[in-house]
């Protein structure tokens, strides 16, 4: 009698939910205080003037104004600032 042994189940087939990271408001846009500017893992962008940093490294506006992205310092770090209106 010919028999075929049952195949094992795959150990793949899982994936995590996407975290929707990235820049939420771009340079030149007007924002209100408290608006989220960047969601990130680690400090890809650093907080500049009128910008706060949450415990998960989310950058948010602490004042109403216009967003400005700039690269500065010896390590060419990217900073996000708010120019108050």
UniProtKB/Swiss-Prot annotation:
Q: Note the InterPro entries from the entry.
A: Ribosomal_bL27, Ribosomal_bL27_CS
Q: Does the keyword Manganese apply?
A: no
Q: Which NCBIfam families match?
A: L27 (TIGR00062)
Which family does the UniProt entry place this protein in? Belongs to the bacterial ribosomal protein bL27 family.
Q: Which GO terms describe its molecular function?
A: structural constituent of ribosome
Q: Organism source for this protein?
A: Tolumonas auensis (strain DSM 9187 / NBRC 110442 / TA 4)
> A Gene Ontology biological process annotation?
translation
**Keywords tagged on the record:** Ribonucleoprotein, Ribosomal protein
Q: Which Gene Ontology terms of cellular component type are present? A: cytosolic large ribosomal subunit
Q: Name one Pfam family in it.
A: Ribosomal_L27
Chain spans, region Disordered: 1-22
Protein name in the entry: Large ribosomal subunit protein bL27
């Amino acid at each position: 009698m010919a028999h075929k042994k049952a195949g094992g189940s795959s150990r793949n087939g899982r994936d995590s939910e996407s975290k929707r990271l990235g820049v939420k408001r771009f340079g030149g846009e007007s924002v209100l205080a408290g608006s989220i500017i960047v969601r990130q893992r680690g400090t890809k962008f650093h907080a500049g003037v009128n910008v706060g940093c949450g415990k998960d490294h989310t950058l948010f506006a602490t004042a109403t104004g216009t967003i400005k992205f700039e690269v500065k310092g010896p390590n060419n770090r990217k900073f996000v600032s708010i120019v108050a209106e």
